[in-house]
């Protein structure tokens, strides 16, 4: 059985903010659509290979960098939970994981 993908409200909001930023910055959604596809494809790979990410601070949380974004997640045999998507160009002191 395939793992279920669960997005925390914070992670989903992170994704929307990132995509909106690029829509507004560029003036169209070409780049944001491509970025969204990249992120979703990567998450599909995490379902198959959940240990790809590096363990975060001796917790069950893992982190994987994709382009300029850190994707924080945890997993069990039944689900993959996306916890946060962080733009690495932002101030790391604001990271709430």
Locations of regions flagged by a protein language model:
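Basic, Lys/Arg-enriched alpha-helical interface segments
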Residues: 2-60
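Enriched for short, Lys/Arg-rich terminal
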Residues: 66-70, 74-97
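Short, Lys/Arg-enriched, disordered terminal segments
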Residues: 1-4, 95-97
């Amino acid at each position: 059985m395939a793992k279920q993908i669960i997005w925390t409200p914070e992670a989903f909001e992170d994704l929307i903010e990132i995509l909106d930023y690029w829509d507004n910055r560029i003036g169209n959604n070409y780049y944001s659509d491509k970025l969204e596809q990249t992120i979703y494809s990567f998450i599909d790979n995490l379902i198959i290979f959940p240990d790809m990410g590096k363990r975060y601070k001796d917790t069950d949380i893992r982190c994987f960098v994709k382009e300029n974004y850190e994707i924080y997640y945890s997993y069990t045999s039944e689900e993959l939970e996306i916890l946060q998507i962080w733009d690495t160009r932002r101030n790391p002191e604001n990271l709430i994981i």
